[in-house]
Amino acid sequence: MLICNDKFNPKTLLEEIMALRPWRKGPFEISQIKIDSEWDSSIKWDLVKNATPLKDKVVADVGCNNGYYLFKMLEHGPKSLVGFDPGVLVKKQFEFLAPFFDKEKKIIYESLGVEDLHEKYSNAFDVIFCLGVLYHRKSPLEALKALYHALKIRGELVLDTLIIDSPLDIALCPKKTYAKMKNVYFIPSVSALKGWCERVGFENFEVLSVLKTTPKEQRKTDFILGQSLEDFLDKTDHSKTLEGYDAPLRGYFKMLKPSKR
């Protein structure tokens, strides 16, 4: 949890926080008020925080949401830190949080998506984190290509995406929705993802972890509006989504942009 012990009027502070719902990423604690977000993002962070050193590196978080991971990255001493997310609400959440958790104003927040990286950030970063974005892209290869070109030579990508459990080079393409999400297009096997990444130009593809999403990590709280994981799974068989697909399984990966291609 990210904690700020500065003192504020608790009633006014809570009103501001609740006006910014839903809180997807967190948790945070400000002046003893806990923002109990839908996702316990510390679980994912613990899986990727030591994937590669961030000290004195130029680092990006593509799909940064409200900045939870950016604030955690600050603790590792990067040279600079840029977050990318086109969402309007999550930027407002970041602007609310930044005075508490980025008091030196080191983070740059860009309202851009992965497809916009080439406009300003070609060959710009030593490390890019892209967590929970790829399966939302209609063209995952184009997204990977954009990430590749945004990295410096010998730069590293830390990637998290939904995957399917299969030894084959295949991807699930949901018919209409996946776990009630309309914007999920391709969920690859690890082998298929490795092929995509290598086709774009990445090398040294490494599996950091594979983990099922559980209610410990994603659940309904007073700080979101609407449903969460428990509502997206088959009521009689939690190994399946409501649509009959396998329940969410996430893979965490690291790869390198090589010196030559």
From Swiss-Prot:
Uppermost EC category: transferase
One Pfam family of this chain: Methyltransf_9
Gene3D superfamilies: Vaccinia Virus protein VP39 (3.40.50.150)
UniProt catalytic activity: carboxy-S-adenosyl-L-methionine + 5-hydroxyuridine(34) in tRNA = 5-carboxymethoxyuridine(34) in tRNA + S-adenosyl-L-homocysteine + H(+)
Key words of the record: Transferase, tRNA processing
GO molecular function: transferase activity, transferring alkyl or aryl (other than methyl) groups
Coiled-coil features, chain-numbered ranges: none
Signal peptide: none
Keyword match 4Fe-4S: no
GO annotation (BP), single: tRNA wobble uridine modification
This enzyme's EC code(s): 2.5.1.-
Binding of carboxy-S-adenosyl-L-methionine, residues: 25, 39, 44, 63, 114-115, 135, 250
The keyword Membrane belongs to this UniProt entry's keyword annotation: no
Subunit details: Homotetramer.
Task performed by this protein: Catalyzes carboxymethyl transfer from carboxy-S-adenosyl-L-methionine (Cx-SAM) to 5-hydroxyuridine (ho5U) to form 5-carboxymethoxyuridine (cmo5U) at position 34 in tRNAs.
Family of this protein: Belongs to the class I-like SAM-binding methyltransferase superfamily. CmoB family.
Name of the protein this chain belongs to: tRNA U34 carboxymethyltransferase
Name of the gene this protein is made from: cmoB
